[in-house]
C-alpha cells in the first residue's frame, strides 16, 4: 500500500491511537479496507473551541492513519435533529421570542434574524464548516435530521422498540446509582461551563418517563413539532404507536414502519449509530464519560444493534485566557472562527496536537498569544535545523499540514509580537507598516505586506479586537519638554549615546543590541558584555533607561519591545522626541 505522506511513526499520542485504530479495524473486519472515525456536534448555538476538540482528536488520528496509506472516513454527525433546549445568551439577532421553539428539532427553529441560512442548525453549522476548511480538516458530514426524516434508521428504530425491555434493563442498572462525589475542581465560570457541554443532550430523558412502560423512541408532535410527547401504546406486530403531546394536547396513532418524525433517545441513538456506521474511534467529552453516562451505557446497548463500542478517549476541557476581555458576541464563549481571526490555522492545530486528549489546555486571546507564537517560531526553527525532540517534531508536522499536503503559510513569518506592535502603532496605515517592516532586516527587506500575510492580518485583528484601549500604544506628537528639561546628566548622556549609534544599528537585531548596550557602555563595559560579566546593578540601569525611553516616546512606563517601537516611530521622529 502506498504511503501518501510521511508518517510520524510512534512518537506521540496520535500515532499510538493510530496503531490501536488500525489493529482494531482489522480485528473487527479482517481484510476489509476503510477505517471509520467519528465526531458528533450539536449546532444548538455557536460551536466553540471546546467542541473543536471533539473534531480535532479524531481528525489527527484519521490523518495519521491516512498518512500510512489506509482509507479513512471521518464522519461528523451533525446532531441537528436534537431538541432545541434553551435560547443561548448573547447571540446577535436572537431574542426571548425564540423560547417558543424550545422542544422542536434544531432544524425546525428559525435562524437568527438577518441570517442567510434556512434554520437555526444550518446557521451555526456554516461557521464551523468554514473554520474546518481553513484548518484543513477533511470530513463527511451527516445530518441526523436527513437520516431520521428519510427513514434511513427505520429498521434500527423498530429493532430498538422490539428490544425495549433489554435496553430498559441496561439503563436500569444506572438509574438508581448515585453520582459519585465530584473531585473538587477550581470553580469554572458560567461561560466555561457552557464551553464544557458536549454534543447531544448528556442529561436527556432516557425514555423512561412515560407511565405505559419504557420506550426508547420519542416522536416530535405532528401539531406543534415539539418533543414533549409521551408514547401511550405500541404494538410490535403492526408497529402501531400512539402518543400524546403534553404541550398542545394533540394525540395520534401512527405506524412506526412508515413514520419518520421522531428519534431514538440519546443514550440509544448514539450506540445505534456506532453499529450502523461501524465506528472504530470516537472520543467523548467529560459530560458523556462519567459513570452512567451515554458513553458507558452505550457500550452495553451497542451489542443489541450487533455492534461494538469504539475506542474512545475522554477529552479534557479547553480553556480560554483573556475570556473576560473578549469582545466576543457569543456570550463569552469564543468559537474556532474567533480564534482564526487572530491566529494562523497552523498555530490552532498545534495547540490541539501537542497535548494528549486528557490534558486540558488554554487558547490565548490576551497577551499570552505573543508568547505562544514565540514558542511556535522557536519550534519551527528547531524543526528546520533538526534539533527538535521527536514528539515536538511530530506535533509540528501535524500542525503544518495533513496527508493531503501543507496548509498555506505566511511567506515571511516575522515575529507576531513585532507585527502586533507595528499594527498597533501604524493604526491601519499600510504604507507606514511596510516601511517599518522593511527596516527590520535591511539586508533582506520585505517588498510587500503580502509577504507577511496572513500573519500580519491576524496580529492586526488581535490588536484591534482584544487589546484594551488603555494598553494601546499612542506615540507622542510633541517632545515632553518638561521631562527633558528635568533630566540629570547621566540620563542626558544615555540619550546621547543612543542617538549617536541609532543610524548604524537601524534594524531589529541592531537596535536590540544597541538599547541593551547603552547602559553597559555608560558603566564602562563593552556593549557586547554578557550578563555573567556584568554586576547586577546593570540590570537596574537598563530598566531605568527603558522606562525613560517609554516615557519620552509614548508617555507610559511600558510599551511594545523598544527595538520594534523605535523602528515603528522612525529615526527622525525618535530624534525629535528624545530632544536632539
Swiss-Prot record:
Its EC number is 6.1.1.6. One of its GO terms (molecular function) is lysine-tRNA ligase activity. Keywords: Aminoacyl-tRNA synthetase, ATP-binding, Cytoplasm, Ligase, Nucleotide-binding, Protein biosynthesis. Residues 178-209 are annotated as: Disordered. Belongs to the class-I aminoacyl-tRNA synthetase family. It comes from the Bacteria. It holds the Pfam family tRNA-synt_1f. PROSITE patterns: AA_TRNA_LIGASE_I (PS00178). This is Lysine--tRNA ligase. CDD domains: LysRS_core_class_I. The gene is lysS. Its main location: cytoplasm. A motif ('HIGH' region) lies at residues 43-51. PANTHER family: LYSINE--TRNA LIGASE.
